[in-house]
Curated annotation (Swiss-Prot):
Lineage: Eukaryota, Metazoa, Chordata, Craniata, Vertebrata
Organism annotation: Xenopus laevis (African clawed frog)
Protein name (record): Axin interactor, dorsalization-associated protein A
Pfam families found in the cross-reference section: Aida_C2 (PF14186), Aida_N (PF08910)
Chain spans, region Axin-binding: 153-220
Domain of life per record: Eukaryota
Length: 305
C-alpha cells in the first residue's frame, strides 16, 4: 500500500469512526473525532506543493471536507436545533474522501476551505519578531497544539448528570484589554490541567467574539466543563487562553491567559486576572499582563443532581 493510500485509509477510518459515534448518539466522542480529522485535513490542504502528494485541486476538496466536519461539529453542539449540517450530509463525504485521487465531480455542498493561515510548530512563535504595538511582554506560545486553522467554535455539550456529582458551566462574558478593538478574529481556548500541565478534559475553543467595544471583547458564551467537579484532581486549574489572528504574519497568536483554581469554583460572578504569555500551565512563573484594572469576566453555574 502506497503512502497516499495509507493516508486515505487512515482518514476514511477516522471519518467512519466519527459517523458511527454520531449515529449512536455519542455526541462528545463524535465531535472529538470530527475535529481531530478536520485538523489533519486542514494541515494537508495547506501544505506546500513540494511536500504533498496531492494536487492543488485535490487539496481544495480536502479542505472543503474539513470545513464540512467543522459544520457538523457545530451542529452537534446545539442539539436542540434541527438545522445545520446533518449526519446524512457527513456520510456523503465518505466516498469522496476515500476516492479523492479520482474524484472529479462537483462538490455536493457550497462550502470553502478554511482560509490559508500559516501553521506553526510548537515553540516556533517564540522566534518570531514581536510587533512594536504588541501587548506588554515577550513573544511566546499558548497551548502546545497552536493550530491557526482550527474551526472556530469547538464547544462540547453538557455531560450526563450523575447522582451526587456537580456539573460546572462557565459563561465567558467578556475580557478587558487596552487594545480590544484591534484584535482580529478573537476567541478563547479553554482547558483543564493538572499541576503538571496535563489535560484532564478535552480542549474547547469558543466561537469568535460577538462584539468589541472600548476596552472589552465580548463573548457571552457558555462552556460545559467536561468533568464533574468532584472528579477533578487536587491542584487542577481551568485555563482561558485569549487568541487572535495576526494578518501581517498570517498566524493565530496567544495574547494572554487567565486561570481559575479549584477553590475559586463557586456559583455567581467571577473576575480573574490576566497574565503575560507564554501560557504557564504549571503556574510557576506568572507575570501580570498589565497593572490596569482589566480582567476576564465569568459567570459560574453549578448543577448538582
Amino acid at each position: 500500500m502506497s503512502d497516499m493510500n495509507k493516508i486515505l485509509h487512515k482518514w476514511s477510518a477516522s471519518l467512519k469512526k466519527g459517523t458511527d459515534f454520531d449515529s449512536w448518539g455519542q455526541l462528545v466522542e463524535a465531535i472529538d473525532e470530527y475535529q481531530i480529522l478536520a485538523r489533519q485535513l486542514q494541515k494537508e490542504a495547506q501544505s506546500p506543493a513540494n511536500s504533498s502528494d496531492f494536487t492543488e485541486d485535490q487539496k481544495k476538496t480536502i479542505g472543503k471536507i474539513a470545513t464540512c466536519l467543522g459544520l457538523r461539529s457545530a451542529a452537534l453542539q446545539y442539539t436542540q436545533s434541527q438545522e445545520g449540517f446533518t449526519l446524512e450530509d457527513v456520510k456523503k463525504l465518505e466516498p469522496i474522501l476515500s476516492s479523492i485521487v479520482t474524484f472529479n465531480k462537483e462538490f455536493p455542498f457550497d462550502v470553502q476551505p478554511v482560509p490559508l493561515r500559516r501553521i506553526l510548530a510548537p515553540g516556533e512563535e517564540e522566534n518570531l519578531e514581536v510587533d512594536e504595538e504588541e501587548e506588554d511582554g515577550g513573544a511566546g506560545i499558548g497551548s502546545p497544539d497552536l493550530f491557526p486553522a482550527r474551526v472556530p467554535g469547538t464547544l462540547l455539550p453538557r455531560l450526563p448528570s450523575e447522582p451526587g456529582m456537580t456539573l460546572l458551566t462557565i459563561k465567558i462574558e467578556k475580557i478587558g484589554l487596552k487594545d480590544a478593538g484591534q484584535c482580529i478574529d478573537p476567541y478563547i481556548t479553554v482547558s483543564v490541567k493538572d499541576l503538571n500541565g496535563i489535560d484532564l478534559t478535552p480542549v474547547q475553543d469558543t466561537p469568535m467574539a460577538t462584539r468589541k467595544e472600548d476596552t472589552y471583547v465580548h463573548f457571552n458564551v457558555e462552556i460545559e466543563i467536561q468533568k464533574h467537579v468532584e472528579k477533578l484532581t487536587k491542584g487542577a486549574a481551568i485555563f482561558f487562553e485569549f487568541k487572535h489572528y495576526k494578518p501581517k504574519k498570517r498566524f493565530t497568536s496567544t495574547k494572554c491567559f487567565a486561570f481559575m483554581e479549584m477553590d475559586e469554583i463557586k456559583p455567581g460572578q467571577t473576575v480573574i486576572e490576566l497574565y503575560k504569555k507564554p501560557t504557564d500551565f504549571k503556574r510557576k512563573k506568572l507575570q501580570l499582563l498589565t497593572k490596569k484594572p482589566l480582567y476576564l469576566h465569568l459567570l459560574q453555574t453549578l448543577l448538582k443532581d
